[in-house]
């Protein structure tokens, strides 16, 4: 069965069956966009450092993350705000201290691969 969309059906292919397999592998455009957004979050070295620290150690407070990454507290807070808005991390308040942790299972899986290579 060919999955070539009608707007591309008139174009010549060399390996038509592979083109159909490639279209199936790409899948839903919304899912591709969601993964691209995740990768964009991970593309910033400072955000990636924060996520690697959280993935390896578990929940940490902003000030502890700042010391671990060499960032200042406001920069850590801003990065965590972005990661929280994207659903990648969540904060758990304990008194006046908020400790953050990675909650996105897909991102955690990617971080596991990154950490294993280091």
Q: Whereabouts are the PLM-identified features?
A:
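N-terminal helix-turn-helix DNA-binding core of bacterial DNA-binding proteins
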Residues: 25, 29, 33-72, 94, ...
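Alpha-helical residues within the helix-turn-helix
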Residues: 67, 84-85
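Short, hydrophobic-biased segments on the C-terminal half of alpha helices
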Residues: 80-81
């Amino acid at each position: 069965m060919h999955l070539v969309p009608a707007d591309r059906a008139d174009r010549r292919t060399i390996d038509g069956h592979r083109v159909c397999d490639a279209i199936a592998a790409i899948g839903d455009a919304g899912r591709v966009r969601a993964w691209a957004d995740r990768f964009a979050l991970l593309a910033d070295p400072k955000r990636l450092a924060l996520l690697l620290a959280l993935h390896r150690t578990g929940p940490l407070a902003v000030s502890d993350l700042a010391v671990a990454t060499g960032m200042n507290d406001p920069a850590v807070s801003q990065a965590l705000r972005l990661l929280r808005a994207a659903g990648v991390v969540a904060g758990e308040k304990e008194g006046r201290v908020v400790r953050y942790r990675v909650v996105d299972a897909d991102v955690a899986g990617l971080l596991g691969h990154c950490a294993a290579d280091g």
